[in-house]
């Protein structure tokens, strides 16, 4: 296994031992050579709103870049601005990368086929898929090397879009 996608998170208000267990688990996976990709959480856009385990240095945290898009749902049209952002309490820029996460067709938990969902949990698998493509070209990369390759491939840069992050996922730049 090369990639672990974690599209769940816990708030800083969660029990300390549960936080530490999850952070230890993702750090250990990273140390074993597994690229850990996590969702930033939907508690933004304020600073220090990234959920655990996305605050770890040993994960790639993904936010949603299209979180201001108007969605159509059961309650009509609404606008959301939800992606968690850093910096973290340890001054780490998070999320590192942004990807599409609004109005994504996904599996229904009620076994009724598919539904449309929005959130950073929808954006993280997009990045995991792009990383899987990159591992086909760079199979010997460590998670740290892959994270650096991703950093070099984003476009536009975070400062160009007014966000504290590396920038938006650009799959073509990542795999060439």
Question: What spans do the regions from the language model cover?
Answer:
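Substrate-binding/access-modulating region of protease and related hydrolase catalytic domains
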Residues: 1-58, 89-92, 110-124, 162-163
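C-terminal subdomain of the subtilisin-like protease fold in secreted/lumenal serine endopeptidases
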Residues: 1-5, 136-176
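Extracellular S/T/G-rich loop segment that most often corresponds to the catalytic His/Ser-adjacent loop
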Residues: 54-136, 173
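A short, acidic/glycine-rich surface segment
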Residues: 47-48, 81-83, 158
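Solvent-exposed, polar/charged alpha-helical surfaces in well-ordered, non-transmembrane soluble domains
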Residues: 24-28, 60, 125-132, 144, ...
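Sec/Tat-exported extracytoplasmic proteins
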Residues: 5-8, 30-33, 40, 63-66, ...
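Short linear functional motifs in flexible/disordered or boundary regions
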Residues: 16, 65, 74, 109, ...
């Amino acid at each position: 296994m090369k990639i672990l996608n974690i599209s769940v998170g816990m708030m800083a208000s969660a029990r300390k031992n549960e936080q530490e267990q999850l952070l230890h688990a993702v750090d250990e996976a990273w140390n074993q050579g597994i690229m850990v990709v996590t969702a930033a959480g939907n508690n933004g856009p304020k600073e220090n709103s990234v959920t655990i385990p996305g605050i770890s240095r040993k994960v790639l945290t993904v936010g949603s870049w299209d979180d201001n898009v108007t969605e159509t749902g059961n309650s009509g049209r609404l606008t959301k601005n939800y992606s968690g952002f850093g910096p973290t309490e340890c001054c780490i820029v998070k999320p590192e990368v942004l990807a599409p996460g609004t109005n994504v067709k996904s599996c229904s938990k009620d076994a009724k086929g598919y539904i449309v969902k929005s959130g950073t949990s929808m954006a993280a698998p997009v990045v995991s898929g792009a990383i899987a493509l990159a591992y086909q070209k760079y199979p010997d990369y460590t998670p740290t090397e892959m994270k650096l390759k991703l950093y070099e491939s984003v476009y536009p840069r975070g400062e160009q879009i007014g966000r504290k992050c590396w920038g938006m996922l650009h799959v073509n730049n990542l795999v060439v």
